[in-house]
């Protein structure tokens, strides 16, 4: 038993910080000669280094356990992820009570960089020598933060909470009864999240030559490659909480908000207040990643040149919902001035929806998923003659994946017998009450509206390659050229292959809407209307 003006139950925090760095410098020299008198020598100097820092905060929650009863009495009770467990009754009396979640956090930052320099030479006959030098550099940096919610809980045979202002992100479980009385109450989701960012590059340059000392000649070669990448993203995921018991009663004099909160009753689930709002949990994802790579090479042993490039972009921007449930044998949601349900499901035998003098609104939460993945690549090769480059081979690819989905987390209330009463208007937008028997009175208008669930997903893949030297025939040679193309399967001397794949998924379905009953005796005193989904 605790009796005080202020009661604070906080967590024990464990903070860790680690730091590491490394620097390595390597020199490699090798030489070889084989039985055919081929000789090669190579030397490379490479340096690389990096650092990584990791910091974390973990919470160990306060645990209060009793074989029989737990009693906490104070003006203000602050519970940070507190874990209560009682064999009989857990009783809380206060003017305000906060049951909040905390978060375990991990933050990582890393950086790495390196550079290399190498030279090589080889010959097979000591008449011609291939010599080369290469230099390279790379840099990568990344940062990430991860947060995982830690919820509090109350577990007992009976849970009684009497307070003025009540805020909860905790799980409340009773084998018998949960009874919460408050002036106002806010139940809300906890959230786990992740952010990440980073980028880097890698560059390599190589120059070489085939040298013939006796002829006083050298044919140069160049090899260049460059790549870069970057990413930036964040996401959050709802961690819902649950109020569970044989009987669950939550009553407020003011507004009762349940967001990201489930109510599970074996027998009776009763939710009441001046105004009652029950809504789904919220999730979001926002990511951007891009990469680019290119390369150029000019060969030495033959007069040739090549080029390649690749680009990739990935983006996502999604807003979705985690639906919540209010279940019991008998479910009653009652307010003096309005009931709003969004993204809620319910299964019961008896359902009572009473908005008092206010409006009754059953709506669906809109989920949007937007993803775009694009990958493009090109590769060309050809010969150089008379200061002119003529492509003789090449390939390319294009891959595009696009997702544009808009669906809904519906409000769906399934029961055997339902009573629906509202002193104002009633609307069922992408939402429905499904029952055998429905009765009640709607003093204002009643409007039902179907919403469209749209799924649009397209995947396109194109790959092409070709080889040969473009040869436009003269007027007197066209017949011979056409014959050669026919025999070789080419066009103007160029062979080409292409493969195209397209996969598309386009679906549109309607949500349920309105009151669907075998016997519907609801009296609508205003205008009753319905909007069907249009294809």
Residue ranges, per PLM feature:
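Binding/recognition "hotspot" determinant
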Residues: 1-535
